[in-house]
Amino acid sequence: MPCGEDWLSHPLGIVQGFFAQNGVTPDWEKKVIDYFKEKLKENNAPKWVPSLNEVPLHYLKPNSFVKFRCMIQDMFDPEFYMGVYETVNQNTKARVLHFGKYRDVAECGPQQELDLNSPRSTTSERQTFYCVPVPGESLWVKEAYVNANQARVSPSTSYTPSRHKRSYEDDEDMDLQPNKQKDQHSGARQAGGLGGLHWRGEPKRLETEASSGQQLNSLNLSSPFDLNFPLPGEKGPACLVKVYEDWDCFKVNDVLELYGVLSVDPILSILNNEERDASALLDPMECTDMAEEQRVHSPPASLVPRIHVILAQKLQHINPLLPTCLNKEESRTCQFVSNFMSELSPVRAELLGFLTHALLGDSLAAEYLILHLISTVYTRRDVLPLGKFTVNLSGCPQNSTFTEHLYRIIQHLVPASFRLQMTIENMNQLKLIPHKDYTANRLVSGLLQLPNNTSLVIDETLLEQGQLDTPGVHNVAALSNLITWQKVDYDFSYHQMEFPCNINVLITSEGRSLLPADCQIHLQPQLIPPNMEEYMNGLLSAVLPSVLNKFRIYLTLLRFLDYNLSDDITKAVEDDFVEMRKNDPQSITADDLHQLLVVARFLSLSAGQTTLSRERWLRAKQLEHSRRSRLQQQKSVNGNEL
C-alpha cells in the first residue's frame, strides 16, 4: 500500500498543509492537484481508494478520499462559495485564514468566530454535477471492479450499518461527526451559510436540530426522493459532484472517474430545512417553486452524498479488463494491446463459435452480430454519423424466450446494455426522452439518456396490434432518430436540444422491423432447443471465465483501432464496384457500395487489420451476397413481409 494513509483518510489535512505553506497565492491549489496525481501514480494506489460504487456509504468516513465511477446526468447552475475566509479568536483577537475549497462547511476552531466582513475573504466559483452510476452497467463489470479494489474499510464511527435501512424521507438524528472532529469544533457558536459554505453551529444546538430532522423531513420530503436514474431497477448512490477546475471540458452523459473528498455532513440537511421553512414566508406560489428546487438541488447528504473533486478523468470505456486509456502512448498500454492482438485470430474464431451456438446454429448471423458489437461512430460528416451499424435480426421465434436469453448472452459480453421491450403499452407509457423540469430546475431522465458505447437491444417480438397514442408516436420517432442520426432530442418545453450519442442498437423481430436499420439479417436456426433456458444456461456455463474475458476484451478493444483506406485500395474498390454495376445494373446501387464498405471496415477490424485487404473485400462481398440471398428466399416464401 502507498506509504502513509493520511491522503486517504484525511485529505483535507494535506490540503491545509499546502494552504498554510503557500498562503492565498494560486500555487497552493495546483500543488494540491499535483500531489494527488503523483500519489495515484504509485503502484496500485487507485485500488486502495475506496469507491462509492462498491463500498456502502455507511462504511466510508466523512471527509475521506474516495472515488466514483459515474455518468453526468445533469449539470446545475454554477455556485459561489467562500474560497478563503477569516476567523477571529474572541479572546486573543488573533486572525486565521482558512480555505473553503473542497468543503461544504466552514470550520471554526475553539473560541473562533467567522468574520463575514473580512477584506481578506475571497469568493470563488464551482460547478455542481448531478452524477449517477453508469446506466446499464453489466454485473460482470461491477464484480471485476469489486475484486480489483483493495481498499480496506469498516463501518466508520460516524455511521452504523443499519443506517441504509432507513427510508428515503427520514434524515433523523445521527451524529456524523467523529469524536475527534467534535472536539475540534466544540467552541463554534454560529450556524448559517454564506457563499456556498455553511458554518458549523453550537454542538448542543446541532444535536437538537438533528433530532428534529425526522419531523422536518416528513413535512418537506413527504414522497421518496427520486434519484433520477435513467433506467429502472438501477441501484447505487447518486452524488452531487462539486467541480473546481476545467468543468467546461465535461458535458451531460459523459462517463467519469472522480477522485475527491466525501462530504456527508448532516448540517447540510439541517440548514436546507431551515431555508425551506424560511421560504414559507414568501409568496405561496414562489415558495412552492423554490421549495421544490431546494429539495432537488440540496437533498439529504445521507441519501445523496457530495464529492468535492480533486481529480476527474473522462473514461473512454468502463471495461475493467483493459487499461483505462487506450489512446496514450504508454508502454504498458502498448504492451497490453500488442500481446492481445497477437492472439486475436483464435479469440475471434472462438467468439464466432460461441455466438453461432447462441443464435441456434446460424453462423452467418453470428458474423454480423460480431460486426455489430464492434461497430462505433468514428466521426460525423455534417449531421451524418459514420460507423453506426444497427442490425435488425429478423426471424426470431415469436412467443419464445429466445430474445430474452440472447440479451443475457450480450450482457455477459459488453460493459453496459439495456433491453427495451417494444410493446404498445410500453411505447405509450415509458418516458424515453429526458425533459427539463423548470419547477425543480433539473433535467428529468429518460430511458434514452445513455452513455456512449451502450448496447441497446430493442425487442419487437412482443409487439402486437394496437393503437399508439401521442406519447407512443413520439417514443417511436425518438427511437428512429436515435438509430438514423445517433442523437436524442431532449425536451426543454420551449425547444428541443440535440444530444449526440453513440449507441449500438440491435433490433430483434419476427418480420422486418418497424424501425430503420442499417442491416437486416434473417435468422435461420439450425436447431430449436426444447428448453431454451436450459440450452442458453448450458452455453454460458460451458465457457471458461478466462475465455469469456477474452471475448470482452476483444469487443471493447477493437472499437478503438484506427482504420484507414489508402488511395490504391480506394481506387481498386471503385473499379470493382463499376464492374459489379456492369454485371447487375438493376440491383447494385450507391447505397450498396456504402453498405459493402461498412461491412468491409468492421470485418477487417474484427481480424485486427487496420486497413482493407483484397481478401477482406472479397469476404465482405461474400457475406453480403449470402445475406441478400437469404432475404430474397424468405421474401419469396412470405410474400412482401421482408
Swiss-Prot record:
Main localization of the protein?
A: nucleus
One Pfam short name: MCM_bind
Task: List, in alphabetical order, the GO biological process terms annotated in this UniProt record.
Answer: cell division; DNA-templated DNA replication; sister chromatid cohesion
**Keyword Cell cycle, does the record have it?**
yes
Q: Which residues carry this modification: Phosphothreonine?
A: 160
One example of the protein's molecular function in GO is: chromatin binding
Q: Where is this region: Disordered?
A: 151-200
Question: What is the annotated localization of this protein?
Answer: Nucleus
User: Which residue windows does the record flag with biased composition (Polar residues)?
Assistant: 151-161
Q: Which UniProt keywords apply?
A: Cell cycle, Cell division, DNA replication, Mitosis, Nucleus, Phosphoprotein
Modification type Phosphoserine: residues: 154, 167, 298
Q: Name one GO cellular component term.
A: MCM complex
Complex formation: Interacts with the MCM complex: associates with the MCM3-7 complex which lacks MCM2, while it does not interact with the MCM complex when MCM2 is present (MCM2-7 complex). Interacts with the RPA complex, when composed of all RPA1, RPA2 and RPA3 components, but not with RPA1 or RPA2 alone.
Family classification: Belongs to the MCMBP family.
**Function, please?**
Associated component of the MCM complex that acts as a regulator of DNA replication. Binds to the MCM complex during late S phase and promotes the disassembly of the MCM complex from chromatin, thereby acting as a key regulator of pre-replication complex (pre-RC) unloading from replicated DNA. Can dissociate the MCM complex without addition of ATP; probably acts by destabilizing interactions of each individual subunits of the MCM complex. Required for sister chromatid cohesion.
Q: What is this protein called?
A: Mini-chromosome maintenance complex-binding protein
Taxonomic source organism: Rattus norvegicus (Rat)
Q: Which gene encodes it?
A: Mcmbp
